[in-house]
Amino acid sequence: MAAPKSAARKPRKKEKKNIAVGQAHIKSTFNNTIVSITDTTGAVLSWASSGGVGFKGSRKSTPYAAQLAAESAARQAQEHGMKKVDVFVKGPGSGRETAIRSLQAAGLEVGSINDVTPQAHNGCRPPKRRRV
């Protein structure tokens, strides 16, 4: 006979960190946009993606979806005391500029904007061209 289950674990409340300065990493691909807000060492405080905000399919790649994802991540980071961020943008997607603007609109002060998109030195073969 199976032993009776012990009491369910209480969900632990997220501890509130007091971090005023951090980094915002925006990865914008052709299919999705992911916004991660970290402290200066790179430990993630909050993140959000276009898909996680509620968009599916081709709507994930829109600038509006990137805007909502950035607002959501900024709101969570401000709960930890975040006030100023340096932005690192990666990828060719359409949500790059919109995500940066919505971070500012959410109340985070943007210190610097860096493009860290990786450039291939003749590495992998790129996908074939679309014929529409």
Swiss-Prot record:
Keywords: Ribonucleoprotein, Ribosomal protein, RNA-binding, rRNA-binding. Gene3D superfamilies: Ribosomal protein S11. InterPro entries: Ribosomal_uS11, Ribosomal_uS11_bac-type, Ribosomal_uS11_CS, Ribosomal_uS11_sf. It comes from the Bacteria. GO terms for cellular component: ribonucleoprotein complex; ribosome. GO terms for molecular function: rRNA binding; structural constituent of ribosome. GO terms for biological process: translation. Pfam families: Ribosomal_S11. Part of the 30S ribosomal subunit. Interacts with proteins S7 and S18. Binds to IF-3. Located on the platform of the 30S subunit, it bridges several disparate RNA helices of the 16S rRNA. Forms part of the Shine-Dalgarno cleft in the 70S ribosome. HAMAP family: Ribosomal_uS11. Belongs to the universal ribosomal protein uS11 family. This is Small ribosomal subunit protein uS11. The gene is rpsK.
